[in-house]
């Protein structure tokens, strides 16, 4: 089973699995309401050209978007950088449904195209959690770590009671499936195959892979949430996940600092069309939200 989101890394991972490993996978997509139309089209392109089946598990998209609305309203009443991640809490049930598909298909092997350079310690760092540089996975798991994380999140939530809404069960159950359930036959393909951005972009062009019209980067363009939360981080903290990603590339020796600075100067430009789509989708007023974010006092 290969998870595919329509993003760059999962699409390239599928290419490797079929063409290099010579496997015949089934792909799985969890549509929680924030997979963009562009992402869906890229999933269709990859699966069609590689001749693989795509199983789509769709959540109650209306419910998921209403949950985002409730939590975003709570966040805007008391902005906290450590709570930005609650806006993406709804996608964690991905981990629940992949186990269902494994049982139904009789396939135990689960391969993910997760890029090890995309780890972002700062997101939980804004809650007061120090980075674990020995962490083996992009997404941390384990009961003690998660209990501490949820306790710090609860403290932040107490500053805006709007967080205590009907989305709580969805959020907590998603975290349970992501962090507490035992995963078996679960591997990240880029732990074994070198991740090379230039080669990935070149390969995806062979599939007529579609780019977003409002940015030059190929990262996160199938994710409807990324443009908005990166706008928050850039406005308030002065950097985004693009900065941490490029910093990790420097540490790996993939690019130099001058190249990284040139890239993030472009990648950190606000993606207003995508932000507008996101806020419309969750039923929020675009101008009102942007004005509220812009009024937040920067921390730098």
Regions found by a protein language model. Give the residues of each.
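Nucleotide-activated chemistry modules centered on ATP-dependent adenylation/adenylyltransferase
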Residues: 1, 16-300
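Short, glycine-rich nucleotide/cofactor-binding loops
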Residues: 2-9
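Hydrophobic positions on the alpha1 helix immediately C-terminal to the Walker A/P-loop
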Residues: 12-13
């Amino acid at each position: 089973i290969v998870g595919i989101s329509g993003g760059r890394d999962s699409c390239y991972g599928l290419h490797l699995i079929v063409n290099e490993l010579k496997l015949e996978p089934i792909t799985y997509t969890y549509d929680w309401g924030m997979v963009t139309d562009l992402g869906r089209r890229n999933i269709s392109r990859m699966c069609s050209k590689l001749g693989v089946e795509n199983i789509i598990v769709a959540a109650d998209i209306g419910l998921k978007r209403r949950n985002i609305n409730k939590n975003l309203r709570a966040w805007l009443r008391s902005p906290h950088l450590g709570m930005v991640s609650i806006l993406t809490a709804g996608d964690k049930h991905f981990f629940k449904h992949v186990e269902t598909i494994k049982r139904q298909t009789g396939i135990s092997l689960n391969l993910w195209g997760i890029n090890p350079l995309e780890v972002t310690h700062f997101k939980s760092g804004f809650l007061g959690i120090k980075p674990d540089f020995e962490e083996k996975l992009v997404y941390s798991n384990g009961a003690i770590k998660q209990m501490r994380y949820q306790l710090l999140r609860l403290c932040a939530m107490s500053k805006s009671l709007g967080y205590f809404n009907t989305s709580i069960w969805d959020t907590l159950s998603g975290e349970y499936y992501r962090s507490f359930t035992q995963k078996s036959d679960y591997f990240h393909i880029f732990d074994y195959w070198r991740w090379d951005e230039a080669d990935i972009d070149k390969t995806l062009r062979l599939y007529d892979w579609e780019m977003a019209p409002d940015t030059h980067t190929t990262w996160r363009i199938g994710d409807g949430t990324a443009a908005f939360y990166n706008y928050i981080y850039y406005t308030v903290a002065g950097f985004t996940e693009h900065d941490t990603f490029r910093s990790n590339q420097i540490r790996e020796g993939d690019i130099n600092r001058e190249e990284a600075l040139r890239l993030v100067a472009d990648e950190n430009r606000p993606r207003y069309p995508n932000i507008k789509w996101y806020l419309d989708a969750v039923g929020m007023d675009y101008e009102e939200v942007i004005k509220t974010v812009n009024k937040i006092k920067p921390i730098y």
